[in-house]
C-alpha cells in the first residue's frame, strides 16, 4: 500500500491499516504502508496496481508509476468520475488498464482508519484497453482474485457504460449538498431541489446517449430502469423514489463534494470529473446541460475563493435563481 507520508507514519504507529466493520468489529490489519509509489515499487514486484486516489491526483500518480519503472504493470482504476482511464493511457501507453467501480460506502475516520458504513461488497470491472495484448486475461484474473477475497464481481463489456453509470450514482445530491450545506434528505425534502437533481440526471443521460453509452446495473442498482423513469415520467412521480434510494443508500454519510467545501474549501475537488464532465461532454456534443454546468461553475467559484461558502449555505433560492438564469424553467416541473 502506498500513501502519503503521514499515512505511512500512522500505519507504522498502529501496526497496519485499521478497519472498522459495519457489525462493530474494529481491527488492525498488518500491512506495509509506503510513503510513496516509488518506495512501494522499489520494495517488491507487483502484478497489479490498484489506483484509489482522487481523480485530480490520477495524472500525478501515473507519472510517479512511470518514473519508478512501473510502466507495463497492470492498472486497475477504481476512481469515481470519468476520464481517469484515458489519462492513464496517455501517460502509461504500455500498461494494461482495467476500469473498476465499487459501491461500498465507507467513512474515512483518520489516516489509514476506515469504517465500512454498509456491508455491500460489489465490484464492477471492465477492460479499458481492449486492443492491448493480454488485457482480456488480466480482467479474468483480477475478477477471480476479488471473488476469492469475498467481493461480488460483475464484468462489463463497455467500461464507459460502467463508469458513466457510476457517475449517475455519484452526482445524485452531491453538488447541491456541498453548495447549500444540506444533507441529501434535506435536498429531496424540497420538491424544487429534488427536481433539480432529476434534471441533472436527465442531462447526464442525454450526454450518455450522445456518446452511445447505455446505463448498466452497477452494484445491482436498477439504473437502466431508473433512467427510463427519469426520462419518461413526470419528475413529481420519480422524486419520492429517488429520495428513498439516496437516503437509504447513504444513511447519515454526506456526499463527497460536501467535504471539498466543508469545514473549509480544499485546494482540489472532483467536481470536474463528475458534474463538470457532464457539462464538458455536453458542450462537445452540442447537448445543453444547464443544471450540471451551473453546479460546476458555482463549485469552482467557491473552491477558488471567488465567492463565500457562507453566502450560498442554506440559500436554495439563490441556487434556483442561478439555474434559471442559465436556462432552466423557473417552475422546475
Language model region names:
Residues 1, 51-52, 78, 157-158, ...:
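Active-site-adjacent beta-strand anchor residues
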Residues 2-46, 277, 281:
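Conserved N-terminal Rossmann-fold NAD(P) cofactor-binding segment
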Residues 3, 63-65, 138:
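Flavin (primarily FAD) cofactor-binding/catalytic cores of flavoenzymes
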Residues 3-5, 23, 35-38, 79, ...:
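Residues at the C-termini of beta-strands that transition into short coil/loop
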Residues 6, 82, 101-106, 129, ...:
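Glycine-rich beta-alpha junction loops
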Residues 10, 67-68, 90-96, 111-221:
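Internal alpha-helical scaffold of NAD(P)-dependent oxidoreductase catalytic cores
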Residues 26-114, 124:
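Rossmann-like NAD(P)(H) cofactor-binding subdomain of soluble oxidoreductases
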Residues 198-333:
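NAD(P)-dependent Rossmann-like dehydrogenase/reductase catalytic/cofactor-binding core
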Amino acid at each position: 500500500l502506498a500513501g502519503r507520508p503521514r499515512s505511512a507514519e500512522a500505519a507504522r504507529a498502529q501496526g497496519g491499516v485499521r478497519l472498522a466493520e459495519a457489525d462493530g468489529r474494529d481491527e488492525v490489519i498488518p500491512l506495509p504502508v509506503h510513503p510513496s509509489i516509488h518506495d512501494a515499487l522499489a520494495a517488491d514486484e507487483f502484478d497489479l496496481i490498484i489506483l484509489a486516489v482522487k481523480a485530480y491526483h490520477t495524472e500525478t500518480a501515473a507519472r510517479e508509476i512511470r518514473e519508478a519503472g512501473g510502466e507495463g504493470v497492470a492498472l486497475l482504476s477504481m476512481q469515481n468520475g470519468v476520464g481517469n482511464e484515458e489519462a492513464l493511457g496517455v501517460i502509461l501507453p504500455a500498461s494494461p488498464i482495467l476500469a473498476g467501480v465499487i459501491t461500498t460506502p465507507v467513512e474515512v475516520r483518520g489516516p489509514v482508519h476506515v469504517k465500512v458504513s454498509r456491508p455491500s461488497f460489489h465490484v464492477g470491472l471492465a477492460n479499458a484497453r481492449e486492443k492491448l495484448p493480454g488485457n482480456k486475461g488480466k480482467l479474468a484474473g483480477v475478477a477471480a482474485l476479488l471473488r476469492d477475497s469475498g467481493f461480488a464481481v460483475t464484468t462489463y463489456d463497455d467500461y464507459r457504460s460502467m463508469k458513466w453509470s457510476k457517475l449517475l450514482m455519484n452526482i445524485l445530491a452531491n453538488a447541491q449538498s456541498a453548495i447549500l450545506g444540506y444533507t441529501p434528505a434535506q435536498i429531496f425534502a424540497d420538491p424544487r431541489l429534488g427536481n433539480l437533481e432529476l434534471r441533472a440526471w436527465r442531462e447526464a443521460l442525454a450526454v450518455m446517449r450522445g456518446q452511445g453509452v447505455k446505463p448498466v446495473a452497477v452494484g445491482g442498482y436498477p439504473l437502466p430502469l431508473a433512467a427510463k423513469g427519469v426520462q419518461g415520467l413526470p419528475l413529481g412521480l420519480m422524486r419520492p423514489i429517488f429520495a428513498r434510494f439516496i437516503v437509504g443508500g447513504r444513511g447519515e454519510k454526506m456526499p463527497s463534494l460536501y467535504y471539498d467545501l466543508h469545514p473549509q474549501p480544499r485546494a482540489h475537488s472532483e467536481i470536474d470529473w463528475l458534474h463538470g464532465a457532464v457539462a464538458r461532454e455536453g458542450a462537445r456534443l452540442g447537448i445543453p446541460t444547464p443544471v450540471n454546468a451551473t453546479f460546476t461553475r458555482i463549485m469552482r467559484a467557491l473552491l477558488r475563493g471567488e465567492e463565500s461558502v457562507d453566502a450560498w449555505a442554506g440559500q436554495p433560492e439563490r441556487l434556483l435563481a442561478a439555474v434559471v438564469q442559465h436556462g432552466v424553467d423557473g417552475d422546475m416541473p
